[in-house]
């Protein structure tokens, strides 16, 4: 009597672990926050008299706003390039992470996603440190100013990217067999 080998074989598939799923959610949140930060009109505000974004600088003169492009200043272009570069890398990492869910062998995608996210974090931290240093150095406002929600969104995106990178760095061999 012949026995069927198909009933005895152990089929082993790579299961999506909760940490990698949370990592993917972190990457998605970072991407959303980056989009909000780049499009935000409020990076620096000053008593309803002045506001600065990554794209334009506006001053209130009498009862109307006068706006100029910020893409004429080297440090503002550098900040924008660093943030957009980081956002592009986060987008690629998100797509690779999303694709890795659909393919059978996910482990080979963990390291590239983590490396991309760490690279994005480095770019964004450089841009977010450069921005206030050069702003304070070059812009002289006689009134109280504060860094606003657009700048905060960019920091939030950086923190979520870092969290996603840490989650994708965790060694899957140590815990994947339990899921």
Curated annotation (Swiss-Prot):
It is found in: Membrane; Cell junction, Adherens junction. One of its GO terms (cellular component) is adherens junction. GO terms for biological process: cell-cell adhesion. The keyword Transmembrane applies. The chain crosses the membrane at residues 21-41, 81-101, 113-133, 150-170. The keyword Cell cycle does not apply. Keywords: Cell junction, Membrane, Transmembrane, Transmembrane helix. It comes from the Eukaryota. InterPro entries: P53_induced. It is a multi-pass membrane protein. Its main location: membrane. Belongs to the TMEM47 family. Regulates cell junction organization in epithelial cells. May play a role in the transition from adherens junction to tight junction assembly. This is Transmembrane protein 47. It comes from Xenopus laevis. The lineage of its organism: Eukaryota, Metazoa, Chordata, Craniata, Vertebrata.
């Amino acid at each position: 009597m012949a026995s069927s080998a198909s009933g005895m074989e152990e089929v082993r598939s790579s299961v999506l672990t909760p940490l990698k799923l949370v990592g993917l959610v972190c990457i998605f949140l970072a991407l959303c926050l980056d989009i909000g930060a780049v499009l935000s009109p409020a990076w620096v505000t000053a008593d309803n008299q002045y506001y600065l974004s990554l794209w334009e600088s506006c001053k209130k003169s009498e009862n109307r706003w006068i706006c100029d492009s910020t893409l004429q200043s080297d440090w503002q272009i550098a900040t924008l390039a660093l943030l957009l570069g980081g956002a592009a890398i986060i987008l690629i990492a998100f797509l690779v992470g999303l694709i890795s869910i659909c393919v059978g062998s996910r482990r080979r995608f963990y390291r590239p996603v983590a490396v991309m996210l760490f690279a994005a974090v480095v770019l964004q931290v450089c841009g977010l440190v450069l921005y206030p240093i050069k702003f304070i150095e070059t812009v002289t406002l006689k009134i109280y100013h504060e860094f606003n929600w657009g700048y905060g969104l960019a920091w939030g995106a950086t923190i979520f990217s870092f969290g996603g990178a840490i989650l994708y760095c965790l060694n899957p061999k140590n815990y994947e067999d339990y899921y």
